[in-house]
């Protein structure tokens, strides 16, 4: 087996994501015929500091969401440079694309074009070496199965209802294995569905497979989840915890937080009080994007108030970007980063962000996007880096379930070497 294996072809095509929007899929072929394929996800509530997702803008085709320009960039500019390169040198591949793009936000080539190529190269390399993707990326120490952060009630941008906060999730941190954690979540999901039906609520699902009932308040969403956990036979706050993603940047207007569904307009301090009240009443272990991406003072307030009690995840705040994360670490805000590959655009930069977070004592939560495909890269990534937490939707809709099923396969492959850390995955909580 050679330590230099040439890339002989890089090509992209337009495929559909789970919201019926076009996205980029890339094939990378090696000199021995080995192929790697990756499809790129897309977000609905996107941070303003994210790398650029290149869309065509022609309203007559796919409502302007076509990605033919990104595909052309893969098939010409990127392919011309990468053909002949060593697929086993991921850093050189990603560095070459970053230099080809030449912008600070992937605005020329598009993060969707670059990420598709980056991941397809990694998959081709793993296939050539006869390794699982998590083994190739993480090496012999890749062994930690993640605690799922499972979205079971959708609101905000992910659903057409009057619930302001975007995601209400469950985390089975009290499970003893990943497969048990998944079973617990599935049982709570079914329990929740029957409860919602009994209460006369709609059980249609949102983009990520969670239910999207027209509840009266955000607190009612938490209450019905607690009820569903108990109905399924589990103890809230012992076996299963609650996580929230308010996606606060979406409700931040003129320096205040507008909870339209509840008829409230709150200052940053009042918003922190709102969360603190919920944390005191319910078994909440994690809040993501509790404050808006540009509300640094709000982030300081929430970190002072809750930063030793619960996990505070920065998504729009950090956008998987080491420059943004450095600012957060220096200012002492948040204690966790959400990792979304397409926010930054290459595997190398993603790994750098995870490493920086962990060195600073921040956890890293590997995440899907609301527009997903059958691609399961993030399941391998979360094990590769021993992150210990994954956010990839409800146990419904096959683009979500694909990731969970891949994790079951990895758990099976690791056998006794595999480790499910449960509450130990929250090393950022000091209480």
Curated annotation (Swiss-Prot):
Write down any Gene Ontology CC term: extracellular region
Q: Which reaction does it catalyse?
A: (2R)-2-phosphoglycerate = phosphoenolpyruvate + H2O
Q: Which top EC class is given? A: lyase
The catalytic activity of this protein is classed by the Enzyme Commission as 4.2.1.11
Q: Which cofactor does it need?
A: Mg(2+)
Q: Which GO terms describe its biological process?
A: glycolytic process
Q: Which family does it belong to?
A: Belongs to the enolase family.
What is the purpose of this protein? Catalyzes the reversible conversion of 2-phosphoglycerate (2-PG) into phosphoenolpyruvate (PEP). It is essential for the degradation of carbohydrates via glycolysis.
Spell out the protein name for this chain: Enolase
Name its species.
Clostridium tetani (strain Massachusetts / E88)
Q: What is the lineage of its organism?
A: Bacteria, Bacillati, Bacillota, Clostridia, Eubacteriales
């Amino acid at each position: 087996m050679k330590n230099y294996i040439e890339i002989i072809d890089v090509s992209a095509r337009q495929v559909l994501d789970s919201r019926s929007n076009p996205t980029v899929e890339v094939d990378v072929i090696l000199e021995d015929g080995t192929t790697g394929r990756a499809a790129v996800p897309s977000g609905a509530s996107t941070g303003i500091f994210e790398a650029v997702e290149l869309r065509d803008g022609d309203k007559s085709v796919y409502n302007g969401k076509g990605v033919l320009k990104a595909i052309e960039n893969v098939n010409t500019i990127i392919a011309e440079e990468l053909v002949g390169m060593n697929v086993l040198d991921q850093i050189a591949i990603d560095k070459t694309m970053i230099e080809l793009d030449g912008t600070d936000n992937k605005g020329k080539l598009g993060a969707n074009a670059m990420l598709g190529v980056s991941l397809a190269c990694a998959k081709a390399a793993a296939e050539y070496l006869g390794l699982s993707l998590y083994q190739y990326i993480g090496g012999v120490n890749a062994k930690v199965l993640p605690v799922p952060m499972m979205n079971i009630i959708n609101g905000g941008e992910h659903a057409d209802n009057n619930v302001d906060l975007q995601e209400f999730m469950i985390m089975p941190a009290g499970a003893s294995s990943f497969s048990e954690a998944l079973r617990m979540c599935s049982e709570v999901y079914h329990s929740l569905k029957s409860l919602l039906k009994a209460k006369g609520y709609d059980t249609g699902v949102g983009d990520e497979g969670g239910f999207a009932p027209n509840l009266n308040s955000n607190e009612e969403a938490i209450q019905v989840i607690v009820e569903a956990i108990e109905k399924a036979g589990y103890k809230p706050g012992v076996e299963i915890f609650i996580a929230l993603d308010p996606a606060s940047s979406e409700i931040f207007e003129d320096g205040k937080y507008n909870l339209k569904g509840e008829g409230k307009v709150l200052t940053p301090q009042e918003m922190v009080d709102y969360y603190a009240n919920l944390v005191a009443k319910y078994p909440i272990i994690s809040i993501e994007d509790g404050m808006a991406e540009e509300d640094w003072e709000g982030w300081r307030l929430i970190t002072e108030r809750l930063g030793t009690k619960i996990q505070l995840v920065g998504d729009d705040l950090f956008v998987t970007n080491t420059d943004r994360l450095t600012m957060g670490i220096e200012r002492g805000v948040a204690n966790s980063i959400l990792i979304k590959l397409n926010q930054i655009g290459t595997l190398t930069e993603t790994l750098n962000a995870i490493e920086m977070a962990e060195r600073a004592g921040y956890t890293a939560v590997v995440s899907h996007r609301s527009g997903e495909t059958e691609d399961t890269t993030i399941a391998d990534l979360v094990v590769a880096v021993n992150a210990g937490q994954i956010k990839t939707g409800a146990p419904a809709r096959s683009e979500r379930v694909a990731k969970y099923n891949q994790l079951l396969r990895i758990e099976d492959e690791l056998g006794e070497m595999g480790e499910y850390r449960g509450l130990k995955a929250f090393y950022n909580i000091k209480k």
